[in-house]
């Protein structure tokens, strides 16, 4: 029976003892089964000289499965790069909540063994593309799996901006910022700010104002194909930013326009058979179990 995957990439949180232990265990276990293993260069040095070390771009190009060991933050960082390649991604949870990391670190063998035999479910998650435009020219751009957030930089204060959906004016805002989230990100920063949870199969985005200076401003859900434009008032101070997944920061100046839209790239998540999104929500968010 042919293998579902031939070349497997290992990615993890650098300088983390628990992650290093799990990566070494994975490397040994997978090598004994005859897989070709590539290790992302930031963690390869901690695993000894026998590892085949590559950068993340080469790993994405050469592997057909990537195993990310860490928390959701590590998964997000890897996903923004790997989404451009034809590669499946599965996670081993070494973080806190772990909405995107299905496998337990101490007993991954059974579930991962089934996945490697072809017994798995595939789920696609779309990404956001964020661009900062200044005087009609694009100054910077990046992608996000969870959310793009306009905010005032290091010191929290109110900012003024206008919101357009498909070039239609929606409203002006005086707030600490704006979160534009995918369904994947709806259980992250957006949830903490009062946004609704969107199931992963929804083709939608949610806009969540951060501490708006009005009682009538509420989160709104729009079609995923909508083009969102945030126009920053020229009266704002400097040092504004747009953050992508809380990792990548794009500088924003007064008068800039931020364009947020669905990316052509998408993440191919691999889940063990029987994966249930609502079970994940109950487990991670402490929801009540069935009464009868």
From Swiss-Prot:
The active site is at 72 (proton acceptor). Its main location: cytoplasm. Its cofactor is a divalent metal cation. It catalyses: NAD(+) + ATP = ADP + NADP(+) + H(+). Coiled coil: none annotated. Keywords: ATP-binding, Cytoplasm, Kinase, NAD, NADP, Nucleotide-binding, Transferase. One of its GO terms (molecular function) is NAD+ kinase activity. GO terms for biological process: NAD metabolic process; NADP biosynthetic process. One of its GO terms (cellular component) is cytoplasm. Its EC number is 2.7.1.23. It comes from the Bacteria. NAD(+) binds at residues 72-73, 146-147, 157, 174, 176, 187-192. It is found in: Cytoplasm. Involved in the regulation of the intracellular balance of NAD and NADP, and is a key enzyme in the biosynthesis of NADP. Catalyzes specifically the phosphorylation on 2'-hydroxyl of the adenosine moiety of NAD to yield NADP. HAMAP family: NAD_kinase. Belongs to the NAD kinase family. This is NAD kinase. The gene is nadK.
């Amino acid at each position: 029976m042919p293998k579902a995957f031939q070349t497997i990439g290992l990615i993890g949180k650098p300088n983390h003892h628990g992650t290093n232990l799990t990566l070494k265990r994975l490397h040994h276990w997978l090598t004994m089964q005859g897989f070709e293993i590539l290790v992302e260069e930031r963690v390869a040095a901690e695993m000894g000289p026998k590892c085949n070390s590559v950068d993340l771009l080469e790993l994405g190009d050469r592997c057909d499965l990537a195993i990310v060991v860490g928390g959701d933050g590590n998964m997000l960082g890897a996903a923004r790069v790997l989404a451009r390649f034809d590669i499946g991604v599965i996670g081993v949870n070494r973080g806190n909540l772990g909405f995107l990391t299905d496998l337990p670190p101490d007993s991954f063998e059974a579930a991962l063994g089934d996945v490697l035999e072809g017994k798995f479910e595939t789920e696609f998650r779309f990404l956001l593309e964020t661009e900062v435009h200044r005087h009609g020219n694009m100054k910077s751009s990046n992608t996000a799996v969870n959310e793009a957030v306009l905010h005032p930089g290091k010191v929290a204060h109110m900012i003024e901006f206008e919101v357009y959906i498909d070039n239609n004016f929606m409203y002006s805002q005086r707030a600490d910022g704006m979160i534009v989230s995918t369904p994947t990100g709806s259980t992250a920063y957006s949830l903490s700010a009062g946004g609704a949870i969107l199931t992963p199969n929804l083709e939608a985005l949610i806009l969540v104002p951060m501490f708006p200076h009005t009682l009538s401003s509420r989160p709104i859900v729009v079609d995923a194909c909508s083009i969102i434009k945030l126009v920053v008032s020229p009266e704002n101070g400097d040092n504004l930013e747009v953050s992508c997944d809380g990792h990548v920061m794009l500088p924003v100046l007064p008068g800039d326009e931020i364009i947020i839209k669905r990316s052509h790239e998408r993440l191919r998540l691999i889940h063990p058979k029987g994966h249930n999104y609502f079970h994940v929500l109950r487990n991670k968010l402490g929801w009540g179990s069935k009464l009868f």
